[in-house]
């Protein structure tokens, strides 16, 4: 376990960040209808999108690829214009409670650009279907099918120096949950199903897990930014799941046994003011109990989704932590 700073008793944030958090929370709360649906028309008023850009900006260009137009399954490829061969590939799943946002939402477009530039890596950000219009297991199906499409078409998608044998999954919040569950599916597949894609690491940034029993963090961190029991309960209901479902409470009473799977080494990121932190720590402990390699990185003075705010020093620190993890996993292949 590693901690990047000493804990404070109170969350202290820059004014810019506080304003952004207030706007995001107000927007999502007002979009959620009492009947469990979402006012998408209202959201579109605030959901600014970044178009793909084939011209490099800060050495990174972007392009979009359609997997299945009928279900709006596509991904954005972030290409770092750097020298060298065998550049890793990071498959990224965005957060948003399974119900909000997309790869071309400005916050996630910016995050993936930073990943591509700083690691460096080819980043593939998957657009999956959203709840409540599309319930479980649509999001996991889309993640798996996107990987299968990359496996079968990588020659026409990725440049020659992109090395799919150095493939990582990454995701934050709901995206961390999707990354975990899609990784299990891939590990269960026959080896002949994925010959190009070799999953060697998973970067789980404040993954969205839960359970029927409330944790101490859920009880104590009332009023924390973005996340509350009411909001998370709404998201699980939108997915059509109870909170002890195997996809929600991954180490709980209905947990999937991964002890016999070649599950990738995992980096789990936790923040001190995130009401989900106990579930994330439990995930880390469960991975270890299953005999899997895992590392826990803690930011005691941060909140849920802190890393999408580039003005925070911890956001930059996390990018470098992720780079270290990627470099160490790649180096282990030749050790």
Curated annotation (Swiss-Prot):
Residues bearing the modification N-acetylalanine: 2
Swiss-Prot/TrEMBL keywords: Acetylation, Hydrolase, Serine esterase
Catalytic reaction list: a carboxylic ester + H2O = an alcohol + a carboxylate + H(+)
Domain of life, source organism: Eukaryota
Tissues expressing the protein: Expressed in roots, flowers and siliques.
InterPro entries xrefs: AB_hydrolase_3, AB_hydrolase_fold, Carboxylest/Gibb_receptor
Pfam families associated with the record: Abhydrolase_3
GO BP terms in the entry: pollen tube growth
Motif Involved in the stabilization of the negatively charged intermediate by the formation of the oxyanion hole, residue range(s) on this chain: 94-96
Gene3D superfamilies: alpha/beta hydrolase
E.C. number(s) listed in UniProt: 3.1.1.1
Enzyme class: hydrolase
GO molecular function: carboxylesterase activity; carboxylic ester hydrolase activity
Catalytic-site annotation from UniProt: 173, 274, 304
Keyword Hydrolase: yes
Stated family: Belongs to the 'GDXG' lipolytic enzyme family.
Functional summary from the UniProt entry: Carboxylesterase acting on esters with varying acyl chain length.
Name listed for the protein in its UniProt record: Probable carboxylesterase 18
Annotated organism of origin: Arabidopsis thaliana
Gene that encodes it: CXE18
